[in-house]
Structure formats: structure tokens, C-alpha cells
Amino acid sequence: MDEKRALTLCGGGAKGAYEIGAVRALYELGETFDIITGTSIGALTGAMLVQGDAEQLYRLWEGLSIRSVMTEGFAFDGSLETLFRNKGDIVPFLKSYVNKKGADIEPFRKIIRDYGDEARFFASPIDFALIAVRFPAFTPVEMTKSRMPRGQYKDW
């Protein structure tokens, strides 16, 4: 049985930002992967790597902010100081969250539409899997490249 090398990427903006630096270092060392998996922002990062868009991915991450992925979003590191500093952003975010029954991630969807290349994704020899959350049930959903229906790449 041939051994395969896999890269697993987490969800969460801070983890994703850290992982981009680690991925860049691995690629600069000439490391390659047969399988890439990701959750949330890690799935976007992984899909772009599968497409062969590492350089474009690095440029995308250099310009990302909370509002690049979520309308009415705000940065929160768990500290009270940050909470008070961002208090003007919290009320609009909470109102939007309650009214829409979740965060408005239309900016994140736009990134997927703008950067996703279904043809290159499916043509790549790199296997891919992701975990997403089914809304509004908030149940996990797993999808692999081999099971993903053509024409629905950007929906995942």
C-alpha cells in the first residue's frame, strides 16, 4: 500500500491565518500533499491549494479582515478590553445575527465565488475533503471531492 501525505486545515480566522504561514513555509520547502482536508476557512484554503492557487491564496489572506468574511463582524479575542473597545460593533452584529438566525457570511461567499475554480479543482490529482455545518440544524456535514456533485463546488 502506498503511503499518502495529508494536510489538515482548521476553521477559525486566527488559526487560518497561522496556518497560511505554516503552509507557505511547507510549500517553500517543496513539500507536497496527496490529500487536503479543511473546516470552514480551512476548507477555502484547502480548496485553493487543491486548485494550485497558493500564490493567489497568500495574496487573499494578506488583505483579509473580519468584514471581508462576515457582514457586521467584529474582532474578539476573549478579553473584556476588546469587548469594550468594539462595543459599537457588537449591537449591530447581534441584531443582524438574531434577525438572520446566524452571521451574514455573504462576503465569505463572494470570496468563494471570486476565487473558486471548479474546473481546476476537479482536474487536480490532490484528493480533498471538508466538514461544514448544515444550517439551521447546525449538524456537521462531510463532503469529499469524489462525492461532490459537479456544478455545486462553490456551494460547499
Outline where the language-model segments fall.
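Patatin-like phospholipase
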Residues: 2-112, 140-156
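A short alpha-helix-loop-beta-strand transition element characteristic
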Residues: 67-74, 116-129
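Internal, conserved structured core segments that host functional sites
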Residues: 128-139
